[in-house]
Amino acid sequence: MTGLYLRSTFSSLREYLTPISHKSTFTDTGEITPEEFVAAGDYLVYKFPTWQWSPAPESKKRDFLPNDKQFLVTRHVPSYVRAADYEHTEKEAEMMEEEDGWTSTNVDSVAPQRCNTEDERRHSIKYIEMTESGASSPEEGLAQHEGSGKHEINDIDELIDETAEESDLANDAGQGGIINDPKKRNYDLYITYSTSYRVPKMYLVGFNSNGVPLSPNEMFEDIASDYRQKTVTIEKAPFLSNTTSVSIHPCRHANVMRVLMKRAAHAAQAKKIRDKDLVTGVAKLGLADGKNADEEDDWENVEQGEEGIIRVDQYLVIFLKFIASVTPGIEYDYTMDAF
């Protein structure tokens, strides 16, 4: 753990000493300027309003960013499953032999992981229902739940309860608030600009089901083991006052983005070739004028030249998908309900 704190100190010093570059090199390097970071943040907030720009305390402001756009934040992002639980499920899936003799791959293991998450959610719902029912034990609560004789809902109108809000308030007042599933955690997520790597940088601050801040070791439980000792650092969030966070080191972000851009460009070019072959084939069948199809090639180049290319303002949306692989139990999809 001492090594992580030393790395944090070195990282902070490097951020302070690195000069700011305003020259755009995104398409060549995958890096972005502060201005491009702001544009990407505006796009993220527009598409997914659960993310918001935030100012920083006066002493923490960075003069190369607008005062009201110092960092991005989304709060109360749920996490029901620890990273180790995901990894255990994935290993089990890889070991299972299918009927035709081949072994499940990482891609195929997504389904059981999602099921595991749904199981945890159902557990959370049952836990709350049983606790609020006044059951003295989970077993008693489950028996009450199963024996309640609730009828099947056949009409959407049956889901509407005009007194539900009042009932919830009354229950909360009588019980001192809803009791949460002890396995559930919530995270506040922050994205700021890294001057040393010229890419976004993610910070996470976690809380348990009672709202108590998680320790660094507890937050590490939500980091995939492959990244835990390589790309994750414990440090004080430099844009907040005395807040311990876990940061995801941005050293590979630019390279990942560059690879993704190459793949997107290759896919766009392959699609263009397929489309051209299709037009040519149709022309040979007499359903189109082959000469006109050839003449339209230049027009297609103008209109489709940027098709499939990742735009710089889309950076943070892609960035979050990369970060999700580092913290598989944190439900980033929750922050993208507006999509």
From Swiss-Prot:
Species of origin reads Pichia angusta
Its biological function?
E2 conjugating enzyme required for the cytoplasm to vacuole transport (Cvt) and autophagy. Required for selective autophagic degradation of the nucleus (nucleophagy) as well as for mitophagy which contributes to regulate mitochondrial quantity and quality by eliminating the mitochondria to a basal level to fulfill cellular energy requirements and preventing excess ROS production. Responsible for the E2-like covalent binding of phosphatidylethanolamine to the C-terminal Gly of ATG8.
The identity of this protein, by name, is: Autophagy-related protein 3
Entry's Gene Ontology molecular function annotations: Atg8-family ligase activity
> Where is the catalytic site?
251
The coiled-coil regions, if any, are: none
Domains as described in the record = The N-terminal region is involved in phosphatidylethanolamine-binding and is required for ATG8-PE conjugation. The flexible region (FR) is required for ATG7-binding.
Q: Which Pfam families match?
A: Autophagy_act_C (PF03987)
Q: Which Gene3D superfamilies match?
A: 3.30.1460.50
Regions that span the bilayer? none
Q: How does it assemble?
A: Monomer. Interacts with ATG8 through an intermediate thioester bond through the C-terminal Gly of ATG8. Also interacts with the 40 amino acid C-terminal region of the E1-like ATG7 enzyme. Also interacts with the ATG12-ATG5 conjugate.
In residue numbers, the region (Handle region) covers 255-314
Asked whether the keyword Methyltransferase is assigned, the reply is: no
Sorted alphabetically, the Gene Ontology cellular component annotations on this record are: cytosol; phagophore assembly site
Region named Flexible region: 86-182
Q: What is the lineage of its organism?
A: Eukaryota, Fungi, Dikarya, Ascomycota, Saccharomycotina
Q: Which UniProt keywords apply?
A: Autophagy, Cytoplasm, Protein transport, Transport, Ubl conjugation pathway
